């Protein structure tokens, strides 16, 4: 089968809906609106991990949600995309940025995933 025949038979992949959240400084966080059942299960187990301190579980759960839900993060007009780049940027974020991200993730979970507990 040639390239063109393969391209004709190509079906567009389904994409999860995305939501944009902006802070007062104009920074934007774009989050996915869907999570697989396995991702939901993993999140719950991380959030309630009895072998870790509550604060450790809470921070790990927030990072887990960040990894799974964030599609793009624009900070001072500099876009960051891709899981590795986003996670690296998150790990060097200021306390204020992390607080905003945590609050945004909480609002997003409440709106799109009411069955999940917020970190």
What are these regions (language model features)?
Residues 14-16, 63:
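A general secondary-structure signal for short beta-strands and their flanking turns/coil
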